[in-house]
Amino acid sequence: MVIKKVNLDIVVGVTSTLPETPFPEVAFAGKSNVGKSSLINALMNRKSYARTSSQPGKTQTINFYNINDSMYLVDLPGYGYANVSPAVKAKWGKMIEKYLRKSSQLKQVFLLIDIRHDPSDNDRMMYDWIVNNGYRPVIVATKLDKIKRSQISKQVKAVRTGLGLRQEDILIPFSSQTKQGLKELWQLIDSYVLPQEENETDSESAAIIQE
């Protein structure tokens, strides 16, 4: 997809009503500081449109980024941030669950996992939660540039094992710095949001990203 127009159309807080959007949506979930905003900026080809921060827990709303007046990239609040009160965490959880269950336009959920570490209990809980809400999430193993090339296969296997992924479940190693994995991500997103006649996803590339 060629990015011609980007706009933060909708911001949903814990007291807000979920919108009925006119375009298909793909959502991004992950623990605080996993690189979610950086990934979304890379997808939008913008340096800092989605606000990034070294402070975990910065995203506290559901943010809908309008792409070309044809789809939304949806940024969900990060989880696992220790300095947030249990009451606030519970509110965020209900907000995310409500979105996953009620959005009629949501086509797929991408779950971000830091490739340097085994999935945490919170990661596994979020994965199970997404599955229980009717989606088989695509896993994005972020911060690929932070490990050596020789470590990639081992760490990908650790993420797959830690989440209990099936052979056919898709995992994409990704770096917001080098943009490795960006093309594969967009090919997948296009396959979910574009009409079939417009979707020219290369089947060979699709096979590669499932390795």
Swiss-Prot record:
- EngB-type G domain spans which residues? 22-195
Tell me the residue numbers annotated for binding Mg(2+): 37, 59
Q: Which InterPro entries match?
A: G_ENGB_dom, GTP-bd, GTP-bd_ribosome_bio_YsxC, P-loop_NTPase
Q: Name one Pfam family in it.
A: MMR_HSR1
Q: Which UniProt keywords apply?
A: Cell cycle, Cell division, GTP-binding, Magnesium, Metal-binding, Nucleotide-binding, Septation
Biological process (GO), any one = division septum assembly
Q: Where does GTP bind?
A: 30-37, 57-61, 75-78, 142-145, 174-176
Example GO molecular function? GTP binding
Q: Name one GO cellular component term.
A: cytosol
Which cofactor names does the annotation list?
Answer: Mg(2+)
Entry function: Necessary for normal cell division and for the maintenance of normal septation.
> What family does this chain come from, according to its entry?
Belongs to the TRAFAC class TrmE-Era-EngA-EngB-Septin-like GTPase superfamily. EngB GTPase family.
Query: What name has this protein been given in UniProt?
Result: Probable GTP-binding protein EngB
Q: Record the organism.
A: Lachnospira eligens (strain ATCC 27750 / DSM 3376 / VPI C15-48 / C15-B4)
Q: What is the lineage of its organism?
A: Bacteria, Bacillati, Bacillota, Clostridia, Lachnospirales
UniProt gene name: engB
